[in-house]
Amino acid sequence: MPKLAANSGGAYLKFLPRTADDYATVSAAAVLTLDKTKKNIADVRIALGSVGTTPIRATAAEALLRGQPLKAEAFAEAGEKAKEVADPVSDFRGSAGYKKEMVGVFVRRALEKALANIRQQAKASAAKATKKAVKKPIKKGKKR
């Protein structure tokens, strides 16, 4: 996988109703890239798992977000849009309807987590830069 661009963050969430080694009932991955102002979405990728015969890109949800300002409502709308491409089957993990509803929730949460990761990385970078700027070389004293 390529290294994420500056102002980017990603997240992968999965719902495991039983054990950690079980297959996911629903999963969603999101990679979010902000513009230089860090107020608008420059690019986004959303992938869904366990709700179709293969992993699914939610391209319509991605298009909905590109160029939009960062708002919780936009993430919720993208989750709703992503539900349109999900084609889950009912099984012992849940009904098709339940899984489709979970897609909306997990896409929204993955986008929120990706944004939180961007902000956390920015704070860590700022703290590292501050710490580096504060360090001053120690001058050796004269020997007597």
PLM feature spans:
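C-terminal structural segment of proteins
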Residues: M1-R144
